[in-house]
Amino acid sequence: MGGVQQLPQADCILLPLPLEQSGLPLAQLLGMAKPGALALGGKVTDSARTIARAAGVELVDYFARPELTVYNAIPTAEGCIGILLERRSRTLWGAAVLVLGFGPVGRALAVRLAALGARVTVAARRPVQRAMAEELGLLAVPLTDLAAAAAAFDTVVNTIPAPVLTAQVLAALPKGCLIVDLASKPGGTDFAAARRLGHTALHALSLPTVWAPETAGEALARTV
């Protein structure tokens, strides 16, 4: 309780990621802080911002910082590869893998899968992202062509926080496809349709803290 008792004197308060894991209700925590204090938390909601304003506390979402996204991309990619190795009955070498999205996580994952010998195709919306993927020796398709391209892949990883793996796209995948969705809740996969079609669909969240907690902590420290 020592830390909580020191809240009224603190100029800066570091809260967890996600913010809801603070232990005590946020209103109680920030109500103990002095007006004008700076609170840093992860995945800050609108309701949390309302609570902070009422307490006179400035609340900053460090999870929204682009540098933290880049730092976390590597442990996320490595954690995803660990899941694929656990769940697949064959090597990633020679596997046809579809990666949806080419932001920091998609890029980090795609190049590492290719380094392991996987035949990686990136599906991205923007032409510049597809060009960057091809420049790295990867294949690339527009997101609008997902349903037409899906039959070639038995392993799919999504990094896009939007409904991209729809029932139509899932129906075009080979039965029993392994799908790992890395996007924030609710993800980009129609999980009910995936189960109905006989696929294995996993929503893998917070991989840096699960697979590389020390690295995740260092990344957070560098950000805040």
Specify the residue positions occupied by each region the protein language model found.
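Glycine-rich adenosine-cofactor-binding loop
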Residues: 1, 93-114
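Rossmann-fold NAD(P)-binding glycine/threonine-rich loop
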Residues: 43-64, 182-224
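NAD(P)-binding Rossmann-fold cofactor-contacting core
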Residues: 1-2, 116-136
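Glycine/serine-rich phosphate-binding loop and adjoining beta1-alpha1 elements at the start
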Residues: 14-94, 204, 223
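A short, well-structured beta->alpha microelement
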Residues: 1-9
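Conserved Rossmann-like nucleotide-cofactor binding loop
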Residues: 105, 128-129, 185
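Rossmann-like adenosine-cofactor binding region
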Residues: 18-38, 133-209
